[in-house]
Amino acid sequence: MYQELIRNELTEAAGVLQAFLADEQNLKNIEAAAKLLADSFKQEGKVLSCGNGGSHCDAMHFAEELTGRYRENRPGYAGIAISDPSHLSCVSNDFGYDYVFSRYVEAVGRRGDVLLGISTSGNSGNILKAIEAAHAKGMKVIALTGKDGGKMAGLADVEIRVPHFGYADRIQEVHIKVIHILIQLVEKEMAK
């Protein structure tokens, strides 16, 4: 009854991934981002990750697989998703939602750390403020974006952009694949 819909959804998802894969710059950017992360971990740095909605879940997924594991057993890496409910509700109430991530970066971020900001539109105000705070702290910034990169375009040390202008879930599907590849590459770099 729904097989045609299922086929169309999977075909569209595969097409978005193929278009992303066809741009060699995306592969270079993923490699550069993994190197930034590994360099930070080698210097006892950490990565702070943030996003909204499904991208928030991706930020938590990323941190979990750094501190826990991905495919193989290995030492944990310092990954923190900015997701503490008491922090988020306090800052939202007292300062406004645009500051929920930047206040955390200001408090916890240090020179040599990395911020991973995830926004399918590239226009999330709270991610933009987190990027600004990270730069002020001397942190490196990796951005996972979509569409044309939005306001985040050009603000990160490394931007990995999924140039899809349809539904955000297609962008998120590529983002989670990129996250898994980043962790795999970090593990290889750390094993050197």
Swiss-Prot record:
Positions bound to substrate: 52-54, 65, 93-94, 119-121, 124, 172
Lineage of source species: Bacteria, Pseudomonadati, Pseudomonadota, Gammaproteobacteria, Aeromonadales
Keyword check for Membrane: no
PROSITE patterns in UniProt: SIS
UniProt KW Metal-binding keyword: yes
Annotated Gene Ontology cellular component terms: cytoplasm
One Pfam family named in its UniProt record: SIS_2
Catalytic activity: 2 D-sedoheptulose 7-phosphate = D-glycero-alpha-D-manno-heptose 7-phosphate + D-glycero-beta-D-manno-heptose 7-phosphate
Protein name: Phosphoheptose isomerase
Cofactor entry: Zn(2+)
Major subcellular location class: cytoplasm
Subcellular location: Cytoplasm
Binding residue positions for Zn(2+): 61, 65, 172, 180
Family of this protein: Belongs to the SIS family. GmhA subfamily.
Organism the protein comes from: Aeromonas salmonicida (strain A449)
